[in-house]
Amino acid sequence: MLKVLLAEDDRTMVSLLKTFLSMEGFQVITLAGATSDILEIVRRERPAIVLMDIFLGAENGIDVLRKLRQMPDLSKMKVIMSSGMNLRDECLAAGANDFLLKPYMPDDLLKMLKSNS
């Protein structure tokens, strides 16, 4: 069972994604709203993939990604960034493995998760 960590500030989106991914056989860890300790949670949980929104309330997902890439024990972790704004190039330059433009279809997310696992 592939472990996925969802870092998203929209609680409705977290609920929908958690339900969908759980039904598809993924083990899902969620972070909604409280993101200040995201790196600590990633380190503790060791997900196979992090699906992270760019806008995380007080945090910026791209900044979190850059910090993650500087941590030797987490630098190789697979990270898929997502946003309603097309910031694909910025995310890939910061070290993301992939980018999903919102709104996206569930099948697109599944394909991306499987190709990055």
Report residues per predicted region.
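C-terminal output helix
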Residues: 104-114
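Active-site residues of response regulator receiver
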Residues: 53
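Alpha4 helix (beta4-alpha4-beta5 surface) of REC/receiver domains from two-component response regulators
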Residues: 18, 63, 84-101, 111
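Two-component/phosphorelay signaling modules centered on CheY-like receiver
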Residues: 11-30
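Short amphipathic alpha-helix used as the core "switch/output" element in two-component signaling
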Residues: 62-75
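Conserved acidic carboxylate
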Residues: 8, 83
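The feature encodes the CheY-like receiver
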Residues: 57
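Acidic, metal-coordinating helix/loop segments flanking the phosphotransfer/catalytic sites
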Residues: 31-49
